[in-house]
């Protein structure tokens, strides 16, 4: 049975997964897709074994206020709930069909329209796309990005929780992960919802493929450098 970050702080030692996190683990350690719940079910989706395909609808998005001034909150989100304080969630995304500006798919922690985070690749043009993350606290979104080649069409993500702090990482092969974002969310202090999303903010549609979803011990280890004052 999995334990969460065993060898870390005393709160983590010998902690067993409970509630929906534990229930969602299938015999091989991957997530039972039947345990996930939709927020805004998409018009087109299909489950094939441990893979889910989501076909986006035009003008679907997640963004709140900052810079653009609009409030978009209609992207389909597929999640599970947990109160566990230490764990990691991993998923592989394939987006060979993305072709229009801002077409995107990735990981999400959606607590409601005013508080959420996401990590994804957003298509820009035939030269580059944005690998980035958005954190929305109290109704205002930010966006941190780096440019990657437009021919990248597969990305792994790892979402980790350490109490009320969160880390998003990405990987091209599902083995070596690189940090994208560390953040704190005041609204995510107890039960959270986390999972996957896909959307097309402009006049576009594509099919996003999610596979190899699993929950593991917390891969984001405790800080071992400078100590608090």
Language model features with spans:
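Extracellular glycan-recognition regions
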Residues: 12-229
